[in-house]
From Swiss-Prot:
The keyword Repressor applies. Keywords: Cytoplasm, DNA-binding, NAD, Repressor, Transcription, Transcription regulation. Its main location: cytoplasm. This is Redox-sensing transcriptional repressor Rex. One of its GO terms (biological process) is negative regulation of DNA-templated transcription. GO terms for cellular component: cytoplasm. It comes from Carboxydothermus hydrogenoformans (strain ATCC BAA-161 / DSM 6008 / Z-2901).
Length: 208
């Protein structure tokens, strides 16, 4: 798998396939064809086969894929065969919504700390999480082996928070602030900019 570049779109689809397979597994379905997966997630079966081919040989011609085996493979490829500890910085509207989202835990992502620098928020509870002072960030990251930091502060403060997260030892940052972050190459940043997504949507609506 190392040595050549796997398209990001393939990785995103792998995550979608994996969730689909998880559903089949829960329903007790044991085999599935690429056509079934394709129909279930809304892509072509050629695309499914091409995506999976990046990661080796799966399935048996004429029989299809063993659901459990393919699910385990996709989870392993996505790094989801173990759980991940995360911290959320910014306990505002978005940070609170992220803390309330159950879906993270179902996929093995555990929030172990929520931080803010607003004294009126520190000590308050968001679901089961008590908002912690930002000064505790490094300690919580270290003690809980946190590898992922989520930035949910206004753009003007995002770089400071990113620098602190990196110094504390996180390996990846999910950044919701609409700004570009400067981090060392070894740290992976994924930015979620909802406005950019909306604008891609409006571009495509107009173009069609
Ligand atoms: N709310 C949304 O739907 C939404 C959607 C997409 C992106 N975003 C982005 O997410 C970020 C947060 O948005 P929001 O609506 O939750 O804002 P918000 O103002 O409700 O919350 C931001 C929180 O960050 C805290 N904060 C500020 N500086 C900090 C620092 N240095 N350390 C720790 N905490 C700090 C504030 O006290 C506040 O509680 C923004 O960058 C915003 O552009 C928000």
């Amino acid at each position: 798998m190392k040595g050549f570049k796997i398209p990001e779109a393939t990785i995103s689809r792998l995550s979608v396939y994996s969730r689909y397979l998880e559903n089949l597994y829960r329903k007790g379905i044991t085999t599935v064809s690429s056509a079934d997966i394709a129909q279930g997630v809304g892509v072509t079966s050629a695309q499914v086969r091409k995506d999976l081919a990046y990661f080796g040989e799966f399935g048996t011609r004429g029989v299809g894929y063993n659901v459990k085996e393919l699910l385990d493979h996709t989870l392993k490829i996505l790094g989801l065969n173990n759980t991940w500890n995360m911290v959320v910085v910014g306990a505002g509207n978005l940070g609170s919504a992220l803390c309330a989202y159950r879906g993270f835990r179902e996929r093995g992502f555990y929030i172990v700390g929520v931080f803010d620098n607003d004294l009126t928020k520190i000590g308050k509870k968001i679901n089961e999480y008590e908002v912690l002072p930002i000064d505790k960030l490094e300690e919580v990251v270290r003690e809980n082996n946190v590898e992922i930091g989520i930035i949910a502060v206004p753009a003007a403060y995002a770089q400071d928070v990113a620098t602190r997260l990196v110094k504390a030892g996180v390996k990846g940052i999910l950044n919701f602030a609409p700004t570009v972050l400067n981090v060392p190459d070894k740290v992976i940043v994924r930015s979620v900019d909802l406005t950019v997504n909306l604008e891609v949507l409006t571009f495509n609506i107009r173009r069609d």
